């Protein structure tokens, strides 16, 4: 893997989402203009199996809020993407000036690590070759759901893609686990630790407690 510091973008992955298991919890996050408090999404086999938040006193209202603004009335959604946004300067500015709800989604998603539920970012474009800025082809454009378009396109897409960004101060670690069991940390205690990524931490270290 490589995290190019010259880019205010993100490093992303969409493969093997059937193996996604666990709970996604964020104490507070804006999804567009909608604020979610204590958002929790449970995943089994790469799909949402339970969900909750604490915006309202009523559990039914909280469920409806998620169904209206994340699930978009699907019974469940798959994991569409995991990416690590590297624009820590934008993250700091959003926190300092309390403008997280004003950021366009293509900026907000690049401020930190995020999961997306729904379709991948290559929806309806999987068959077109896509390249990184360094000229290398992006080959992981499909997954077990989007590939269904070759037989029945109605089973391949959900027509939604919602990015949920995790604040750095809520991160323990993001770690690569290889097939042989060896590991490499990318983020540890809310800071980038891959050699060469130290400049990404400067805006984070400059934030007021």
Which ranges hold each PLM region?
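Residues that cap or initiate secondary-structure elements
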Residues: 30-32, 47, 88, 121, ...
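Dual-mode signal for accessory low-complexity, basic/Gly-rich regions
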Residues: 50-122, 126
